[in-house]
Structures are given as structure tokens and as C-alpha cells.
Amino acid sequence: MIGSLGVGDFLKCATAGNDLLNSLGATGSIATGLHNNVKYLDKFFEYLDLPTEMYYGTIPTEKRSDGKYDIEFHDVSFRYPGSDVYALRHLSFKMKVGERVAVVGMNGSGKTTMIKLLCRLYDPTEGYITLNGIDVKKYDYGDLLALFSVVFQDFRLFSFSLGENVSSNVEYDEERVAQCLKKSGMGETLARLPEGTKTAIYKDFDENGVEISGGEAQKIALARALYKDAPFVVLDEPTAALDPIAEADIYARFNEIVGDRTVVYISHRLSSCRFCDRIAVFHEGELVQTGTHDELLADEGGKYRELWTAQAQYYTISNEQ
């Protein structure tokens, strides 16, 4: 009969109407989210429009296959923008080619500030820093940054493939990525992944992606630093999320992992500093001691011995019942 509506047609219309209402509701939620995020975009663009006061030089860095780069701090002091307090004071310090330098100290002692200045995320308030005798400000900024592979404590991984996370690029050398992952202790995990380095991390964009632990994330970040193959490697608490066995493995293979690179190693665990050539001890924004583990431990009034003793007491087996 003309104008009649069968049961099947009615159900189709009802389903379509319900889908339409759901879609309108979702559209409303998206519109609300966009409206709420506009204020954050405004702040973001305000940040991008801030003028930079850093001087960008034009001298290209020397491309040396032997990795012979020396960096030296010359009476460097630094205050963060908007602060009257010096985070670092009168730092004079030289890093030699191929040296492994551990940087230790309590929170707020100036360790991370020193690293930020080393990588030229900031410029010194006073004093200057040289690379092979030339003020780092005179070098091309991009060339200078290319000399450093850095793993900060607050590193981030992305919901891309494992290979893209290690190489920081869409196109990468799969074999080299695998080698770096094996060096960082991810070899067994990599072997278990169904798609190898093409396996997605997390499930945000790929339902077949894998969830990783904090320790695995730290190993991937270390592999990322190795893949860049820069002459300077900066590691800020690189084993903080690892279990004791994995951490011991990293220490045992440290020289094999970093090769002939110059390494700056920041750690609160003083036991991890023993494999380094030299230890720099910071306290209240100043470099107060430098030397080997044995040399610093022999200084009974030194800050390093104080820190070492404070940590060692928790690892000493007591005979008390």
C-alpha cells in the first residue's frame, strides 16, 4: 500500500535517527573541546612570538671523524630569567675528548643547569663556554646542537613505530636501530615483537601497538641517543627506571655502549659513578670537588664522601638481630 511503512523500514529509520543524534552529540563535544583549547593555542602562539635574545653564530662546527672536541666552561655563572638567585656560580671546568664525567650533587645543586648551558639551551649570565677554543655563541646553532645526544629525565616517546622513536625520523636504517636497541638492553624485547622495529608503541593510533614499561621506555631513550651518533652524549639519570639487574648490565657494558664518545653522566646513585673517569661534585650552585671515586672518597671532609656515606648505610648488612 502506498504511504505505508514496513517494520523493516521503520527500524532502519529509527536506527538512522539514533545515529544522527549520537553524531550531533559527538559534534557538540568536539566543538566544546575546540572552544576550551583555543585559550591554550593563544598562549602557545604568544610563546612562539616571544623574541629570542640568544645570539646565533654562523661558523660551522668542525666535522671531525676522530671526535676530538674539547668543551670548557670559563668562570660561568647563570641566573634563570626572572630570578635574582644564581643557579650556577663561577664554574670553570674542562671536558677532555673521550672522557666519562659523572656529575653528582643534591637536588638544586646546579647539575641540570650545567647540562642546559652545555647544550646551549641557555647562555651564561656571566663568563663563556668554548668548543675547541672558540666561544660556542659563534657557532651555527644547528651545527652545535648536532654534536650532542641528550637523554633528559623527562624524555618523551611517541605513539609511532619503535624505529621512528629511536631514529626520530620516518625513514631510518632498520639494522642500525636494531643494533642501538640491543646495546641499550632491548634486544630480547625486540626479538619478541611481531613486526620488529615497525611495531607501534602504545595503542593511540594502532590497536596492535604494544604498551611498554618505564624501564623499557628508558632503554628506548638510550637507544635514541646512540642512534644519533654524536660525539657528546649527555645522560641524565639514564637508569632510574631500570631494575637492579638491568642497571648492573648497563654499568658492566657502559664502555661498549658509548664507545669513544665523550660522556656526561648525571646520577643520584653514586655507585654508578665508579666506572667514570672523573666525578664532578656540585653543591649549592658551585663545583666543590673533582676527581676519581677513590680520590674523592679519601677526602674525609668532602661533600662526595658525605653523600656516599649517606647512601652506603642503606646497603650495609647489619649484624644486629
Predicted feature locations:
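Cytosolic ends of transmembrane helices, especially the final helix of ABC transmembrane type-1 domains
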Residues: 13, 19-49
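A hydrophobic transmembrane-helix motif
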Residues: 1-19, 71
